[in-house]
Amino acid sequence: MNSVAENFTDYVVADLALAGWGRKEIRIAETEMPGLMAIREEFAVVQPLKGARITGSLHMTIQTAVLIETLTALGAEVRWASCNIFSTQDHAAAAIAASGVPVFAVKGESLADYWDYTHRIFEWRDGGYSNMILDDGGDATLLLHLGARAEKDVSVLAKPGSEEERVLFAAIRAKLASDPTWYSVRLAAIRGVTEETTTGVHRLYQMFERGELKFPAINVNDSVTKSKFDNLYGCRESLVDGIKRATDVMVAGKVAVVCGYGDVGKGSAQALRALSAQVWVTEIDPICALQAAMEGYRVVTMDYAAEHADIFVTCTGNYHVIRHDHMARMKDQAIVCNIGHFDNEIDVASIEGYEWEEIKPQVDHVIFPDGKRIILLAKGRLVNLGCATGHPSYVMSSSFANQTIAQIELFTRTADYPVGVYTLPKHLDEKVARLQLKKLNAQLTELRPDQAAYIGVPVEGPYKSAHYRY
């Protein structure tokens, strides 16, 4: 399908003519996403999301297209935007628009466009409102909460701390000028949010602790079949894909620094070591640092690594992990990139005044006053999505199966979830894993009743306690 009905104009994509290509890749992805497709089949007749109006803010990729079409197959209406200005796959967005789903996503969109699109996914053509949010990084959730606060006290928009906040605050001011209750009305209609990633989850917990969160949230990120698979195994494949596509660098023999040794850092370090890099790790947490050391990685500080390493990867979820003084001391042609959700892990703002030379889209030389150049990938945003196509379909099937289950759970059992941040129960985590195993022809051992009694668990599971660390 390369065109939409003449009266359907509720979308913004780069080129609708790419829809045919996108549809072909979606069909391939479906064969690699067993968990998500099994859930689509299981609930197709019941239609548990009938009546759900979902605002989706998540990378508009081929894999996300399969998620969107699963949600609609289960009865939901959906409006979608990407959660990152560089992560959209234009052919995926075109295919979704051609199917009649409102989508607003263009690879390389401006910050102004980004926040415009994030507003538009809350605006339904019939004047109705979204009742669910599916978020990645928390921007859709943030927009409604911050906007509602600004309705009461516009001074919350007085001091932007970054260029992105400046653009966001301006967008909120403009919307309030035309509709003073735009945010609070939409905020009140939301039943809940399901959050995809570590950074967004941190935001939710902070909002809840401050008493600011206005609806329940399910923390999808901390489902085992998300964080221990998407974050680790997904990054293990997609990080080096992005670095290689961007630079064609020979990784073997280089010193590569991984900043942060959580699940994303673990996968990133494994990937770089598999290509025979000398991998160093920076960490603040002594437990994670000890894990890195026991895996054979050298644990150092950024202050030490800055002038010695060849490749730098941030994956901490923190702020200014690589500062200006670090970059000023780096080698000529050092490669600097980020695989954490937001672009502020690297202090890109501090080097914006220098000369930039675009090598190709999302690959820039930043030229320092002394003539030294570093290679900055995706302008400090997600390198695997900015410079490549993100995680493989198979691992995203686990994450998106969790998202779909979480949407069903919150939408159909809203009364069971007072305002707070929740995780999915263990038996649903195990269900996703079972569905995924089928694709790999794995043979799962069945627990005998006497064995189950011996260790005190049901034959059918769940098999681990809630606090078990995988």
UniProtKB/Swiss-Prot annotation:
Subcellular location, record wording: Cytoplasm
Domain of life: Bacteria
Keyword annotations from UniProtKB, A to Z: Cytoplasm, Hydrolase, NAD, One-carbon metabolism
Cofactor(s) in the UniProt record: NAD(+)
Coiled coil: none
Single GO MF descriptor: adenosylhomocysteinase activity
Gene Ontology annotations of biological process type: L-homocysteine biosynthetic process; one-carbon metabolic process; S-adenosylmethionine cycle
Gene3D superfamilies: Adenosylhomocysteinase-like, NAD(P)-binding Rossmann-like Domain
Keyword presence, Nucleotide-binding: no
Pathway(s): Amino-acid biosynthesis; L-homocysteine biosynthesis; L-homocysteine from S-adenosyl-L-homocysteine: step 1/1
Sites where the protein binds NAD(+): 197-199, 231, 260-265, 283, 318, 339-341, 384
SUPFAM superfamilies named in the record: Formate/glycerate dehydrogenase catalytic domain-like, NAD(P)-binding Rossmann-fold domains
Binding site for substrate: 61, 136, 196, 226, 230
Top-level EC class as recorded in UniProt: hydrolase
Entry note: cofactor: Binds 1 NAD(+) per subunit.
InterPro entries attached to this UniProt entry: Adenosylhomocyst_ase-like_sf, Adenosylhomocysteinase-like, Ado_hCys_hydrolase_NAD-bd, NAD(P)-bd_dom_sf, S-Ado-L-homoCys_hydrolase_CS
Transit peptide as UniProt keyword: no
Main function: May play a key role in the regulation of the intracellular concentration of adenosylhomocysteine.
Family the UniProt entry places it in: Belongs to the adenosylhomocysteinase family.
Cited NCBIfam families: ahcY (TIGR00936), PRK05476.2-3 (NF004005)
Protein name: Adenosylhomocysteinase
Species of origin: Aromatoleum aromaticum (strain DSM 19018 / LMG 30748 / EbN1) (Azoarcus sp. (strain EbN1))
